[in-house]
Amino acid sequence: MGRVWLAIVLCGVGPLVSATDLSLSSDRVEAVHSARLTFEQIGSVVLKSSSAEYSSGLRLLPAAGESGFDLSSGRYLAADLESLASHQQRVCLQVRDSSRDTYAGIALDPGEKTTIKLHLPHDFIYASPEGAKGVKTLDTRNITDIAFLVVWPYEGQFSGLLNVRISNIRLAGPPDHARKVALANYLPFVDPYGQYLHGEWKYKVRTDADLRGDLARERGELKPAPEAWDEYGGWANGPQLEATGHFRTEKVNGKWWFVTPTGHLFYSLGINVVKTDSDAPNGYMHRDWYVSPPQTAMSFPTWNLRKKFGKTDFAEDYYDFVLDRLDSWGINTIGNWSDGALTKLGRKPYMLAFDLSGVDLPKLSGGFYDTLDATFADKLKASVQAAAQVAGSAQAQAVTDPMCIGFFIGNELSFPTDSAYYEPFFKACKEALAAVAPSKLYLGSRFKSLRNSEALWTAAAKWCDVISVNSYVASVAVFTDGQYAAPKFDRPVLHSEFHFGTLHRGMFSAGLCPVGDQCERARNYKRIVAGALRHPYFVGSHWFQYRDQPLVGRGDGENYQIGFVDVCDRPYPALCRAAREVGEMMYNVRAGK
C-alpha cells in the first residue's frame, strides 16, 4: 500500500483534563464473549478476538463501590490505540449510561498508532425541550461502562480479527459550555438559512452576502481533475484493454475493475444524492422551531442556492459548478439518488436506479417479492421498460449513454430466509435490464449489509454484473476473510453507501458511523477506501451523501451531519482534501505500485 496512506495529519484531542479513574487495571477490565486480554506493565491492555459477535471486546467497569464513571469534565473521551494485526482492522469506543449509548469508530492499518476519540453528548449542555429536535444526550456524570468492540459485525471468524493495544484512556478538552442553551430560550432553534441558531462555528453563514461571496471564492480555489485520469476518470496511463464503447468489468492481475468505454481501468469513487435540494420537512408543522417559519414544505438548500447564484433558475449554473467541484475533489462518479438533470449533462460517469417502490408486483407476507409467482418476471420487466421509455427522463437517456455505468434495481430489500426466492429475483432483474439497456451493467439491489447468507451472495453473483452493498462500517478490508457467512464467489463488489459524521456546525446527529471531529471524518474516509482498494473484489466506493440532511430531519427523522457540504452549500474542507488525495493515488494503490 505504501507509506503515503499512513501520512495522515494527526487529529488533536485537546488538553488532558482531570477525571474519574480510567486506568486499565485487571480488577476493572473484563473480556466479553471470545475476547482475550493481556495486561502489560506499562498500563496498557492487548485486546485479541477471533470474533466480532455479541459485542466481543473489552469492557471497563467503574471502581468498586462506584455506580459509574463521571465523564462530565471533558469534551472527548480518548484512548491511544496500536494495531498489532497484519490486516486493516476496525475498533469502536462505546460509552453507556443507564439507558442509552453512543460510540465512535476507527480503522487501523497494520502497525499503526493513533488516537480514537468520542465526542461526549453531555445532557447538561445539549438538552433540548421535550418535542423539539436536539442531540441524543447521555448522563455523562454516571456512565455505567466503557467498551472497546466492533459494532454491526459482518466479519467472519478468524484468528487475529481484532488485535490491538489500548492505553491511556482519558478525558480531553473542556466541555463546550458555550453550546448550552436555557430550555426557555431554545425555541426557535433554526435560523433563516436552515442552520442551528444557537451555535457558533467558523463556516456559519450570517448574511446573504456570505452566500454570494462563497461562489467567487470557491471557484478560485477549484482544481482540475487529477492528471492521471482520462475523460471518464479512468486510469489514463494504465493498461489499454478492449474498448467496447460502454462500461464493463474485467479481472486484471487478480483484481476486479470497471473498464471505461475507451478501455482504461476505472475505480468508481462516487458521492450519492448530488442534488440542488434535500429532503424537505413540512414547514407548517412546528412553526415555533423556525426564526422565519415557512408556509409549506421547505428546502433550505434551494433557498440558499437562489441567494448564492442570485436567481431562481440556478440549477444549470449550479450543476456546472458541482461538476467542477467533483473534479477538484477527486470524485469520478455521480452516485445513486442524484438529479437526472445533472447526469444528463454527460460530463461524468454515473449510476442510476429503476425504483421498485409503487410497482405492482406480487409479494410475500414478509414484504419481499413473490419471485416464484408466474407473473413476477413479466411485471418486473414491464415496469423497467416503462420507466426506460419516459420521454426526457434520466433513465431514457442513460440506456445508450456511454457515461452511464449501469443500473440498480431495488434498494436494501429484506430478503426472506427461504433461498428459493433469491435467484428468480436476480434473474428477472438481469433480464429486464438486458431487454432495455443491453450495454449497461446490472449493479444489483444494494444489500443493506455485508453480512448475508452464502446462498444470497451466490444467487446475486450468478446474475449481477456487480454486487452493490450499503455498509456503514469503518473498514471493509476483511469482508471475505474467515469462515462465518463468508461469501464464496468471484464477482466485483461496489461499496454503494458509507459515511462518517460528527457533531459539528450545529448538527444534532453524527449518522451511522460517528467519529470525533472533521479531521477524523477525513482520516476514516481515506482508511475505508484504502481497505477497499486493497481488496480484490471492490470496484468502487460511494459516499452517502453529498449534503448534510436537514437539521430537523427528513421524513423518517434522519438528520445526520454526513455531507461533503452543509445546508448552506459550504464544503467540509478536510473531507474534500481527503477525497482529492484518494482520487489522485487510487490507481497506483489498487495496482500495488
Residue spans for each PLM region:
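Short carbohydrate-recognition loop motifs
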Residues: A35-R59
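Extracellular ligand-binding interfaces
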Residues: S50-G134, N142, S159-R165
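Active-site-adjacent substrate/metal-binding segments within catalytic domains
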Residues: E200-L345, V359-M403, A428, F544
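Extracellular glycoside hydrolase catalytic/binding regions
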Residues: M285, W289-T296, Y421-R527
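Active-site groove signature of glycoside hydrolases
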Residues: A387-A420, A435, L443, F538-Q545
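Substrate-binding cleft of secreted/luminal carbohydrate-active enzymes
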Residues: I405-G406, F498, C513-F564
